[in-house]
């Protein structure tokens, strides 16, 4: 049975009187730090000099190199990209942790796959908002919140559970509700969702649909509209009310096609492939591949990225988006 915690069920403020170092000031970092600060907590930022360092200072924070921020803190929230966390932890965080400190993460990758192995005398917990940082911040300022997951990997103090819940409340997540999980469950489900559905699955489905239409002689521009551009319309409907709302909102022709043709595309063989992807996540094969490629300068990663950018759908999309001024208000600035 899933357990969900809300504002009123967080009885103890285990963060009270503690200094929090947020390491990193990117998408999640700025949201966590600003929400915690607005809720009255003592927050410092740990980050290397650069644009994010300057932005954090401009936003009114005391900003330090990572090692100096960690030295001051009781709770250290690590919000850096997965591939650099291990190095930063080893060089700048670990030497400055003290017994009784707490080490926190918004994604369990490096703890679950033993890239980071904290000492036994610190708490280790997870608070993972289920939305990007800009949404975590925006909903907070509007008086609502994004739901989150939380969990405890190591309870050295005997109070790590309350500390994790208090942190979740501190960033505003308990307004919407937070679900208890484990580092293992959060990491494996998150990676699977990204690889099999949200990123890997969807992009391959779209590309294959685009190629099928173009190879059959249809205009690439029409193919783009039908298999990529309109994806947002369908996803928005599912986001708002699940598959039921989506199917209620489309034509009977589209709904009938959904039922009779969907299973021809996503066959039982595809599900077996999904299970193989999940197995590679569970047994560490994917993590080891990612970690090794990172050590080798991401040679395979960059090669795959370049190949993906060379696909015809990229150029067609770029041209068509110039016809759509309504997409000028971008969520992400490159």
Swiss-Prot record:
Q: Which positions are annotated as binding Mg(2+) 1?
A: 190, 194
What Pfam families does the entry give?
Answer: KARI_C (PF01450), KARI_N (PF07991)
Please state every residue range assigned to the domain named KARI C-terminal knotted. 182-327
Q: Which cofactor does it need?
A: Mg(2+)
Extract one GO cellular component term from the record: cytosol
**Reaction equations catalysed:** (2R)-2,3-dihydroxy-3-methylbutanoate + NADP(+) = (2S)-2-acetolactate + NADPH + H(+); (2R,3R)-2,3-dihydroxy-3-methylpentanoate + NADP(+) = (S)-2-ethyl-2-hydroxy-3-oxobutanoate + NADPH + H(+)
Residues annotated for substrate binding in this entry? 251
Which GO BP annotation is one of this protein's? L-valine biosynthetic process
UniProt family annotation: Belongs to the ketol-acid reductoisomerase family.
Q: Tell me, in a sentence or two, what this protein's role is.
A: Involved in the biosynthesis of branched-chain amino acids (BCAA). Catalyzes an alkyl-migration followed by a ketol-acid reduction of (S)-2-acetolactate (S2AL) to yield (R)-2,3-dihydroxy-isovalerate. In the isomerase reaction, S2AL is rearranged via a Mg-dependent methyl migration to produce 3-hydroxy-3-methyl-2-ketobutyrate (HMKB). In the reductase reaction, this 2-ketoacid undergoes a metal-dependent reduction by NADPH to yield (R)-2,3-dihydroxy-isovalerate.
PANTHER family assigned to the protein according to its UniProt record, in alphabetical order = KETOL-ACID REDUCTOISOMERASE, MITOCHONDRIAL
How is this protein named in the record?
Ketol-acid reductoisomerase (NADP(+))
User: Which species is the source of this protein?
Assistant: Staphylococcus carnosus (strain TM300)
State the gene name recorded for this protein.
ilvC
């Amino acid at each position: 049975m899933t357990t969900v915690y809300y504002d009123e069920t967080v009885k103890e403020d285990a963060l009270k009187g503690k200094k929090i170092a947020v390491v990193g000031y990117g998408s999640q970092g700025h949201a966590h730090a600003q929400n915690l600060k607005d809720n009255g907590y003592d927050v410092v930022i740990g980050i290397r000099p650069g644009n994010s360092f300057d932005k954090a200072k401009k936003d009114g924070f005391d900003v330090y190199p990572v090692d100096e921020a960690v030295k001051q803190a009781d709770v250290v929230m690590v919000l850096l990209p997965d591939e650099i966390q291990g190095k930063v932890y080893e060089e700048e965080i670990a030497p400055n942790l003290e017994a009784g400190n707490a080490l926190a993460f918004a994604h369990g990758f490096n703890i679950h796959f033993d890239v980071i192995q904290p000492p036994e005398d610190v708490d280790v917990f997870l608070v993972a908002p289920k939305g990007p940082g800009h949404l975590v911040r925006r909903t907070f300022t509007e008086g609502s919140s994004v739901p989150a997951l939380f969990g405890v990997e190591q309870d050295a103090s005997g109070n790590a559970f309350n500390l994790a819940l208090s942190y979740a409340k501190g960033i505003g997540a308990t307004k919407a509700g937070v679900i208890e999980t484990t580092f293992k469950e959060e990491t494996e489900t998150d990676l699977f969702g990204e690889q099999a559905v949200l990123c890997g699955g969807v992009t391959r489905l779209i590309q294959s649909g685009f190629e099928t239409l173009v190879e059959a002689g249809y205009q690439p521009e029409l193919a783009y509209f039908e298999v990529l551009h309109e994806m947002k319309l369908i996803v928005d409907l599912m986001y708002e009310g699940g598959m039921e709302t989506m199917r209620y909102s489309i034509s009977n022709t589209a709904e009938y096609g959904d039922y009779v043709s969907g299973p021809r595309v996503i066959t039982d063989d595809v599900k077996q492939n999904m299970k193989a992807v999940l197995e590679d996540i569970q047994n560490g094969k994917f993590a080891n591949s990612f970690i090794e490629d990172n050590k080798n300068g991401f040679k395979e990663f960059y090669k795959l990225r370049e190949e993906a950018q060379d696909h015809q759908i990229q150029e067609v999309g770029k041209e068509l988006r110039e016809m759509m001024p309504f997409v000028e208000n971008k969520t992400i600035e490159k």
